[in-house]
Amino acid sequence: MADKKTVTPEEKKLAAEKHVDGLVQKALVALEEMRKLDQEQVDYIVAKASVAALDAHGELALHAFEETGRGVFEDKATKNLFACEHVVNNMRHTKTVGVIEEDDVTGLTLIAEPVGVVCGITPTTNPTSTAIFKSLISLKTRNPIVFAFHPSAQESSAHAAQIVRDAAIKAGAPENCVQWITEPSMEATSALMNHEGVATILATGGNAMVKAAYSCGKPALGVGAGNVPAYVEKSANIRQAAHDIVMSKSFDNGMVCASEQAVIIDKEIYDEFVAEFKSYHTYFVNKKEKALLEEFCFGVKANSKNCAGAKLNADIVGKPATWIAEQAGFTVPEGTNILAAECKEVGENEPLTREKLSPVIAVLKSESREDGITKARQMVEFNGLGHSAAIHTADEELTKEFGKAVKAIRVICNSPSTFGGIGDVYNAFLPSLTLGCGSYGRNSVGDNVSAINLLNIKKVGRRRNNMQWMKLPSKTYFERDSIQYLQKCRDVERVMIVTDHAMVELGFLDRIIEQLDLRRNKVVYQIFADVEPDPDITTVNRGTEIMRAFKPDTIIALGGGSPMDAAKVMWLFYEQPEVDFRDLVQKFMDIRKRAFKFPLLGKKTKFIAIPTTSGTGSEVTPFAVISDKANNRKYPIADYSLTPTVAIVDPALVLTVPGVVAADTGMDVLTHATEAYVSQMASDYTDGLALQAIKLVFENLESSVKNADFHSREKMHNASTIAGMAFANAFLGISHSMAHKIGAQFHTIHGRTNAILLPYVIRYNGTRPAKTATWPKYNYYRADEKYQDIARMLGLPASTPEEGVESYAKAVYELGERVGIQMNFKAQGIDEKEWKEHSRELAFLAYEDQCSPANPRLPMVDHMQEIIEDSYYGYKERPGRRK
């Protein structure tokens, strides 16, 4: 007789790999067939498969009970029912095929695709219900599944999978939609998890198995162990809490991972609760029996030197309380369903505070709420991180406090944790037999696993234009002597006027006070007249302190851009004293999505802006430019909360403005309008304003400077505000970015700086770039065409975009010269060497400026450095390098 051949480990491994490869290859074929199923077919398959499993739920429960010798037949039947009924009902209307969602407003379309072949790992604790659950969610998502069952539950698990498979195939699923390893082994399970054809691993089991799943280099939905505390606080419904915990802990002899492992009871209700607990056939072990129980369950006794290495005796899992007591060496009354052991603390010294997966529960007394929460937290952190924790209380706030304190994904309130954890019976958690523990438990999933976890959701994003806006002061008054509105403005009693010394000396401040004195009510006012050109943050802070002391209900900003800008930031600091200046100056791409959200203003005061120069447009804009002179920085601050409440545009206030100032501010108006017109955020609403402002400047600036007649001064004053309205909503570009930084470094006049730079910027933006700016509405580069539009409007040569760009740049330069501006920085008294030394730094700072993102061409630092260097000599001598 021949000797029986001995199979070597290598041969065993190769055989397992061959078997697994065959299963996976068939699953891959099934995957392609399942992709062809529509939603109606999928739902029909799931319905038929679930009904077949439901029909056999008792038979399967008995098979599992007889094969494993663990748990309670009736409870296993309930778990099978749960998998067939609650899980399927929850995902009944879930779309898992093709287009599952379409939103015309956001432009998003979601398309569901299967993840691929699923490796299903099942435990001995819930063999049939887990097989049913994983098969059904795989069928729902068109994923073939290949199981590796726990060896001790191979037959019953395969029985469950076969029933689901056969019903699914009969309903139209492909032949190999559900498969399993027929000869279980570690080698086969490892081969399945590591097979390149397997897309994801759905693992339920011990920590070692879950860790192995996560080590396979592919997506894994593995879940961790639980060590669930139930804290019974003194306000709890004692009868309900005792009932729930006994029902939960005894269910299937404690084999559900969400079952309570310890009950923590406030001292005030301890005796009453224990008595209620005992009435449900819970046996409290004495000191001697506790030691025997510890020795049998964990091989150590409390406070012994080997406690740290205690390991659960797997034989007790799912066994009856009477059997465990007998094996431990003591007897308990017939019908005992839970063994309770009073413990002094949570942790290694009390082995019974570990997870036990059996009808054995630790009982601890809490001295206070804080102590109860602490003990519950310690339980969760004692090898149960992320899983579940329960609390029984009538105090809603305590429930929230408990939820914040424990590192558990599921916090179950006033419910049995077994059913609370698996969901849908006592609460609105997703029904599942695979419970994720999140990062606390080193899991990739932090929720109850369901069909959604087995889908690849593809997103189709249709291009959409961002919603745009027109935000301006609620009221804008214009025409001569419109300052009389101050007589009629409502709710004006305490007025702070922010201005500068020039307004005092020219008598404009007196004219404002005169209007306030004509009101029917007596007005108290505070004057802050210390605003300097390019106001410094220290000036703003001084004004804010005065404002806080005075407590105005109205702020009037009187003057040019400097008083209005300073007053805006004082307004912000006054109403929102906690705001940090550094937060205000941060750059943004989209003002609505900025990292720092400006607070809303206007709750304490209204803001009335009265311009006395025709340049900044600050009376209608959300912008303020504040300097940090200690660091040679100038910061443009932008937010619509800074938009004035009321603007009064009275041309009578600009009649005495010196011609040189009118020239500088007028060219600033032209720059505002030009940059707003070509901005990537320009719209139909801002374009008309920008073009009208440009037209008014070319028609009236020269006369305004040289003749100072009322008509031209009025038109330029209107142009300033109209341009402000345009750039308040379309924003600016790199002419202002560079002007801010040059002005901060060399203290040049802002409008004049823009005048010198603007021809260069027109040529730069008017050249088709290699890198364009980012804004959805700006769907193609068109700055050159828009400059051509301006040139045509002005009657300049513009037969092509290129000609229009050159004509307009030249016209801007010549207008600057005609109004007396020396159109280069050399003439501004700046040293050439110093200018070149700072050119690179200024270009970097300009790139970071808030005005740069709206420029129609993505501004490159090298290019801005060239513009800065060329502009020293002026457009006529060095017109710039077209790039």
Language-model segments: residues:
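Glycine/threonine-rich beta-strand-loop-alpha-helix active-site module
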Residues: M91, A160, T538-A652
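ALDH superfamily catalytic-core signature
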Residues: T6-V7, K13-L14, I132, V210-G347
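Rossmann-like NAD(P) dinucleotide-binding subdomain of oxidoreductase/dehydrogenase enzymes
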Residues: V99-Q240
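ATP/NTP phosphate-donor binding region
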Residues: M467-T554, F825
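N-terminal Rossmann-like NAD(P)+-binding subdomain of aldehyde/semialdehyde dehydrogenases
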Residues: A2-T109, I137, S279
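Conserved C-terminal structural/oligomerization subdomain of aldehyde/semialdehyde dehydrogenase
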Residues: R35, F330-N466
